[in-house]
UniProtKB/Swiss-Prot annotation:
Belongs to the short scorpion toxin superfamily. Potassium channel inhibitor family. Alpha-KTx 01 subfamily. Has the structural arrangement of an alpha-helix connected to a beta-sheet by disulfide bonds (CSalpha/beta). The keyword Secreted applies. This is Potassium channel toxin alpha-KTx 1.6. It comes from Olivierus martensii. The record marks Y57 as: Aromatic residue of the functional dyad. Residues 1-21 form the signal peptide. It is found in: Secreted. One of its GO terms (cellular component) is extracellular region.
């Protein structure tokens, strides 16, 4: 029983989709300003403005 719980816990931890964030030095005031920056630098539109800097996700 204990082994099956540990196995289930290991499967859940391994299946979590870790998102890799990539920081930029581009200033922003809204997340929509980061979308073209992220597309140009990393090839994805997934990004948001955090602490007045663009942060892109792959």
């Amino acid at each position: 029983m204990k082994i099956s719980f540990l196995l289930l816990l290991a499967i859940v931890i391994c299946s979590i989709g870790w998102t890799e964030a990539q920081f930029t030095n581009v200033s922003c005031s809204a997340s929509s300003q980061c979308w073209p920056v992220c597309k140009k630098l990393f090839g994805t539109y997934r990004g948001k403005c955090m602490n007045s800097k663009c942060r892109c996700y792959s």
